[in-house]
Regions:
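Mid-domain Rossmann-like dinucleotide-binding core that forms the NAD(H)/NADP(H) cofactor-binding site
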Residues: 111-180
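NAD(P)H dinucleotide-binding glycine-rich loop of Rossmann-like/cofactor-binding domains
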Residues: 63, 73-140
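A local structural motif
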Residues: 1-4, 158
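Residue-level signal for nonpolar/aromatic packing positions in well-ordered secondary structure
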Residues: 52-54, 67, 101, 120, ...
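Short, conserved catalytic or interaction motifs in soluble domains
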Residues: 59, 103, 165
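Cytochrome P450 core scaffold surrounding the K-helix E-X-X-R motif
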Residues: 27-33
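Glycine-rich beta-strand-centered segment in the early N-terminal region that forms part
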Residues: 6-24, 35-76, 85
Length: 180
């Protein structure tokens, strides 16, 4: 079902964004099909990640202004409430959930960054607590999250061993920085 909603107004420390592109990832499929761990209250708008331009800023927002190009990860709150919404024309998010994007980056590229890089970053820094000099094995390294894991692993100073199928995928993973 598609509904028309009023323009969104940001509260303190929030920004309203005109969505120009939204990422689509497996978690969105789980939400839409009712398989996500904590289903959102209905009606809900799916979509975890977006890119666009800031329409308005709430009180207390620093470092961002109307017209800035940004990517956003829409917060998921683990208290049983969910706020997604990237599959809409506008979203409101905390300013802590956005990053500026360069003028030469397409919105479709920026919209695909938050979940894949966020997943890899959390896995490597919070869960695995990867340290410089350690060895990281990335299976499926030519996929989205695997590619991000290779790059983040190298940035963290790890020796990265990556697996991929086919010579073209292996070459791409090596271009991303995999050691083996």
């Amino acid at each position: 079902q598609v509904n028309e909603l009023a323009d969104l107004q940001p509260a303190a420390n929030q920004v309203a964004i005109q969505v120009r592109a939204a990422g689509v990832n497996p978690a969105d499929w789980y939400v839409v099909n009712g398989f996500f761990q904590l289903p959102p209250a209905l009606p809900a708008t799916p979509g975890f990640e977006a890119a666009g331009e800031i329409l308005s800023v709430g009180a207390g927002v620093e470092g961002f202004a109307v017209g800035d190009r940004v990517l956003a990860v829409l917060p998921y709150l683990n208290d049983g409430t969910a706020t997604f919404g990237a599959f809409a024309e506008q979203v409101v998010v905390p300013s802590s959930h956005i990053l500026g994007i360069p003028a030469n980056m397409e919105f479709v590229t920026a919209a695909a960054i938050p979940v894949m890089y966020g997943t890899a970053h959390i896995a490597l820094t919070r869960r695995a607590q990867l340290q410089p000099g350690e060895t990281l094995l990335v299976t499926g390294a030519s996929g989205t999250t695997g590619s991000a894991a290779v790059q983040i692993g190298k940035r963290l100073g790890a020796r990265v061993i990556a697996t991929a199928s086919g010579s073209e995928k292996v070459a791409r993973v090596q271009q991303l920085g995999a050691d083996v």
